[in-house]
């Protein structure tokens, strides 16, 4: 047998290995093949190929493993149990850029599923190696490493802290300054994942100088980058007044308001979220947003989108309104009430309706003027029907009831109150009658209208416990009228008259 023939055996074996890993990597891109591959024992066949003498076979084997592990936690678990992680971590430090990208992809695919799987990656010493990859010359390697670190950090505080302790943050801040858009996106996303868990972790990101660099990218034309930048700033600002003020000091207003008009729905949503996370802390921060035109811009934004995209904007209006009557009035003047009423009526999902109900309650609870601004939009009957509907979620019923009470307790606009005399359940009716008892003694026109509209008659039909607050309110109303009028409208009065007719003896 000649040397050529002997070498041919090896060449054929190499070709077969190459063909096998390429086919598996290709098959792993389609969900319908995954179970068959798993049952055929693909994991144990790929493992030795990670240490193959041929670099392209190693890389393709890693790529195939990553695609498999990406699908579900069973396959990710198989990577951990198959003792593949230490091999990957070792190769991550030693191999070329193509292999590094593939290995980091496997680590990300395993770590994304659960805190336990992410912990397995930490336990095998991957963080230090991934952080070294953040300094790699190749932007693709940096991106793959940043992506894996972000996926590990997003699970919980402990894993995030482990990423910080490995020294990732200063390098991620350098990555957001690199020219490659994809790298900027992933690094900003990783900083967001780290910041979200606690004020301390967010502070670490701030101390590395991240805010200024993130703020500069708010106007970047790339929508996906803007999403991540706004998300990272939100995750920093949400924790405390100090952190929110640091974000504001980076001069994000009024520039961030342009994002509320963006074509990308998630840029809009994340911009609203950022404004909400700042507004919620203090009246001063809310006032700053009002002064920058932020309230009107958010209201326009809510009008231009639907569903969950609206939610942060709705909540932001509620937070601003909750701080003070002046801030609530700023929302009312900017036409916030009609927009929130539309959300309350239009949105199919209960949690969005509940947020709108809560925000309307915050707007109407300050003074009679505030309550009237909400009541004239015919919002109260909608809130009542949501509260009464058996189809409403528990949270929606609770928020609607609270909003009705908040508004009713300040409302002196009687045309909005009157329908409630007929439709409201006893626990709401008490507040309605209470408001009439406050207004009628001081308004003769309202007293007359209350009689002609049938309100007084309705009040006489209410059955109240003697000595109860409701009975006190009814007595206050009755005291506004001559006794014979009250008697005239009381149930059974016509029977009494007829009895008198029957018992009357003509002279």
UniProtKB/Swiss-Prot annotation:
Keywords: Cell projection, Cilium, Cilium biogenesis/degradation, Cytoplasm, Cytoskeleton, Flagellum, Microtubule, Repeat. InterPro entries: ARM-like, ARM-type_fold, Armadillo. SMART domains: ARM. Disruption phenotype: In null embryos the central apparatus is unstable leading to a loss, and presumably degradation of proteins to which SPAG6 normally binds, including SPAG16 and SPAG17. ARM repeats lie at residues 31-70, 73-112, 115-154, 157-196, 199-238, 241-280, 325-365, 402-441. GO terms for cellular component: acrosomal vesicle; axonemal central apparatus; axoneme; cytoplasmic vesicle; cytosol; extracellular region; lateral wall of outer hair cell; manchette. GO terms for molecular function: microtubule binding. Highly expressed in testis. Not detected in prostate, ovary, spleen, thymus, small intestine, colon and peripheral blood leukocytes. It holds the Pfam family Arm. It comes from the Eukaryota. It is found in: Cytoplasm, Cytoskeleton; Cell projection, Cilium, Flagellum; Cytoplasm, Cytoskeleton, Cilium axoneme. One of its GO terms (biological process) is cell division. It is linked to Defects in Spag6 are a cause of hydrocephalus and of male infertility. Interacts with SPAG16 and SPAG17. Important for structural integrity of the central apparatus in the sperm tail and for flagellar motility. This is Sperm-associated antigen 6. It comes from Mus musculus (Mouse). The lineage of its organism: Eukaryota, Metazoa, Chordata, Craniata, Vertebrata. The gene is Spag6.
């Amino acid at each position: 047998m000649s040397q050529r023939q002997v070498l041919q055996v090896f060449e054929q074996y190499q070709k077969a290995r190459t063909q096998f890993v390429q086919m598996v990597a290709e098959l792993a891109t389609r969900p319908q093949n995954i179970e068959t591959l798993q049952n055929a024992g693909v994991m144990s066949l790929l493992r030795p190929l990670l240490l193959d003498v041929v670099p392209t076979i190693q890389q393709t084997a890693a790529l195939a493993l990553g695609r498999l592990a990406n699908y579900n936690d069973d396959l990710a678990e198989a990577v951990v149990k198959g003792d593949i992680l230490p091999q990957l971590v070792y190769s991550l430090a030693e191999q070329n850029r193509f292999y590094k990208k593939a290995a980091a992809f496997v680590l990300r695919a395993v770590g994304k599923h659960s805190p336990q799987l992410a912990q397995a990656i930490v336990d095998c010493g991957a963080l230090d190696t991934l952080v070294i990859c953040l300094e790699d010359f190749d932007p693709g390697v940096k991106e793959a490493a940043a992506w894996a670190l972000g996926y590990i950090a997003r699970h919980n505080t402990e894993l995030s802290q482990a990423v910080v302790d490995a020294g990732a943050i200063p390098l991620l801040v350098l990555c957001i300054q690199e020219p490659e858009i994809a790298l900027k996106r992933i690094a900003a996303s990783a900083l967001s994942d780290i910041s979200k868990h606690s004020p301390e972790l967010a502070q670490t990101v701030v101390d590395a100088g991240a805010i200024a660099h993130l703020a500069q990218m708010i106007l970047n034309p790339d929508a996906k980058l803007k999403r991540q930048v706004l998300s990272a700033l939100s995750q920093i600002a949400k924790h405390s007044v100090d952190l929110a003020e640091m974000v504001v000091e980076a001069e994000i207003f009024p520039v961030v308001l342009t994002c509320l008009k963006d074509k990308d729905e998630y840029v809009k949503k994340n911009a609203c979220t950022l404004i909400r996370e700042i507004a919620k802390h203090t009246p001063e921060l809310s006032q700053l947003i009002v002064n920058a035109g932020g309230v009107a811009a958010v209201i326009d934004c809510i009008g231009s989108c639907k569903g969950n995209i609206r939610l942060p904007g709705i909540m932001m209006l509620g937070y601003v309104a909750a701080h003070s009557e002046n801030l609530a009035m700023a929302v009312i003047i900017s036409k916030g009430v009609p927009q929130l009423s539309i959300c309350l009526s239009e949105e199919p999902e209960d949690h969005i309706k509940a947020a709108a109900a809560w925000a309307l309650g915050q707007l109407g609870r300050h003074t009679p003027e505030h309550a009237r601004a909400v009541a004239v939009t015919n919002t109260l009957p909608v809130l009542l029907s949501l509260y009464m509907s058996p189809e409403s979620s528990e949270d929606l019923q609770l928020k609607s009831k609270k909003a009705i009470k908040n508004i009713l307790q300040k409302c002196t606009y009687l045309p909005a109150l009157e329908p409630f005399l007929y439709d409201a359940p006893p626990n709401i009716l008490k507040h309605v009658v209470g408001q009439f008892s406050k207004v009628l003694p001081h308004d003769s026109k309202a007293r007359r209208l209350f009689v002609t509209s049938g309100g007084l008659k309705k009040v006489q039909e209410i059955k109240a416990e003697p000595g109860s607050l409701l009975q006190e309110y009814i007595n206050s109303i009755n005291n506004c009228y001559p006794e014979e009028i009250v008697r005239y409208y009381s149930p059974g009065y016509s029977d009494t008259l007829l009895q008198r007719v029957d018992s009357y003896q003509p002279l």
